[in-house]
Amino acid sequence: MLIGFSQVYAQTVSGTVQSATDKSGLPGASVVMKRAASDAILTTSTDVQGAFRFERVPSGNYTLEVRYLGYDLLSRPVQVAQAPVVLGVLSMQEQNTRLGEVQIIGRAPLGEQKGDTSQFNAKAFKTAPDASAEDLVTKMPGVQVQDGRIQAQGEEVRQIMIDGKRYTGEDVTSAMRNISSDMIENVQVFDAQSDQAAFSGFEDGNRLKTINFITRKDRRQGYTGKISAGYGTDERYMAGAAINYFNNDRRITVTGLTNNINMFDFSIGETPGGGMRGRRGGWGGGSPTGIINTNNFGVNYQDKWGKKMDVSANYNYTNRDIVNDQYRFRDFVSDEAGLQYTEDSNNRDREDGHRLNMRLQYNINQNNRLLVTPNLRVQNDESFTGRNARTFDLNGTLSESLNRASSDNTTFNFNNNILYSKRFGDSGRILTTNFNTSINNVDGDGFQYEQTQNFENADNNVLRDQFIRLDRKNFSWSGSTNYSQRLGEKSRWQLEYSIGNQMRDSDRRTYDYVETAGEYADFNMPLSSSFKSDYLSQSVGPSYQYRNDKTRLQVNARYEYAVLDTDSQFPVDLDPLKRKFSNFLPSAEYEFKFSQSQNLTLNLRTNTNVPSVEQLQEVLDISNPLQARIGNADLEQDYQTRFNARYRNFNAETNRVFFIGMFGTMTNNYVANSVYTTSAPEGLAEGYEFRPGARLSRPENMDGYYNVRSFFNYGQPLNFISSNFNVNGSVGYSRIPGKIDGQVNYSNNTNLGAGFNISSNISEKIDFTVSTFSSYNIVSNTLRTTQNNNFFNQNTSLRYNWILWKDLVYRTELNHQYNSGLSAGVDNSFLLWNMSLGKKIFKDKQGEISLSVNDLMNQNVSIRRNITESYVEDVQSTVLQRFFMLTFSYNIRSFKGAPAPDENMQRGPGMHRGGRPGMN
């Protein structure tokens, strides 16, 4: 009775938070409602205009508290009765401490922890005047670049927001490179809910690590961007531009790039040739592999159509030509001592693709919302690989293979998701429905030529010349319905039903070259396959959620029933195979807030995965004849359990930050590789003759896969050198099951890593970052226990920007990599040194002419170690080496009501004068 009475009188509470000084809205402010008679608490944050809204607030007396960096706490009582509460404008007073006529000036606060959101004050991290958002965030605690990708708190950043609105598109790094750092007031790092979870209010396990950039109020109307062009030695060239237009809700970004210096996208914070930020790093830093010519054009659009429609879209065209030579060394896990494999290959790839992503959200009314997110990708790939490979043991060479392979494939991918949510007034009931469709087709052809010499028996030498035709069609759809109901002030329950269907049809036909006919006319049945699969899954189950001011708990229990139908017509016409699966899929999430600055989150999820058509299709792939592969139509779905634990502590008074996290995965029925080295079971690979030292791999379900890793970061200011200091470390362990000639092998890899980072906070004229990270890997196998593949890797880097006398700008970047324990023939260490000297020109200093050098020492290399259940390999690839380039760049900065660019360079080192942090 009491619960029902409370629900009847649940109301909305809304208002707008503004600065008392200039009446501007304060975005990202923390708004909390505490109930006077209990420990119940409600939290939210303001949008880009400073507005906030609480839904379904039970009647009673509350205390409303608003917090914002650089402002005094605002607190006021609020009474909720039988009508919506409109608080109107809430004005916050700036913090401004004076002693007589002497103003107290201190270091800008680093930020604060707001629940599970880490918020950083951008002005507490000094960057160069023309820096990008990427340059800014990589100075912040827990944020780093790993293998060319941005990571935050140990996880890859998967989504970018600007003032709380999602940046539509697939490339997170590109988005950050096109936002100037001087536009940003605060940076928020958090795990964003999926659209489904945000609409329903229940977690679905699909959170994405997200960075939200809250822009300065004087940077929301105007233009920003950069135009650059350069030419250098060895006919190296680059021309690119990025232009951003901002008019409050409307935001348009246009980018273009053409170059042959391995830049994949344009960055407004980079001087091409003298920096690496426009490129994608390889293992341990360094350049991307190969010599890459890229032509790229993109448009990003975001707007609000009327009062109810939010629209965003992203279009990208990319044309890329890649030339890459590689050396590969493999040390096999085998009963044959010293069995190894080497390969020299030259690779040529041409890519031509279009991508279109859209997001349309229609807020029909207060209780109904509709979200449509279509995505389209069309791509053509042409590739050529020439490979010279050999296998050998302690007695010498066993076989040598020369083969060439070329292909021309066109991929069409379309995905559309429709999400609808309905709230039944203030009753607390919510209905959410979701429907998704996906089409993924691949159409292409290719040629393969092989000449293999058998050193044990010349009669078994192989000469092969073939044409291959591929036609693959995949169509899938899925839908779900969720109904949730409030049980009281602190708890809710939900019932969910979902259904999905994946239909895949793969047809691969191989023809041998007939010398007398002069064409590819002889159909090769063993190397051809026609295969279909149909996977239908359904699940149903309840969820329960409880929350108060300190605790959030959610538990889910789903029952899943699935059917997998497969049908193979050739190489062997098999009867259709039907397999049925039933699983119990529990999940749970727990969060405890020790205080506003400390919280702990625990998460457990389970799910199943169906094998891919490539894994199911029993067709022999001998594109690399010494490393052949074949599918397995008897594969079953795997069962995966994932868990993670995170603890965050952000002390705003001392500016000390601490994160620690643990992430783990355990998989039953893991799709492992079963490797055959001498002969395969009868009928498995008809028509294939084993070359000496060759291997045939086939997927097989096995238990015993584990992957556990942990990460920590501690950061604090070093005031005596006006810098920020971060120390981080990691511990990881993985166990990968597999089979070698029927014997079970577990590949165990333990990884230990530690490093530190010091980034300057002196002024915009001096900007440096020094970092180092070392890792040691212990690799062991249960079959070959004497094999030692342990290795050590250390990467140390320095980035330094200095605005000298008379507007001269010096930039340098050093990256040193040291490796120990790699195979012979692979470079153990290198020093990559990029440098530029530029001169600011024009009255407003927005132009620059610079002379830069890439890889001054001409030592750059790319090295990668891969660890599997059947071998350990080292790969060294072609990289771009030394060249010089003369570049002209022009920075575009024009904002309504903003100070001139040179005025922005006059702020002191990490200081602010009252008011909002870092603002004059």
Each predicted region: which residue ranges?
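Short, acidic Ser/Thr/Gly-rich low-complexity loop/linker segments typical of extracellular
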Residues: A36-A51
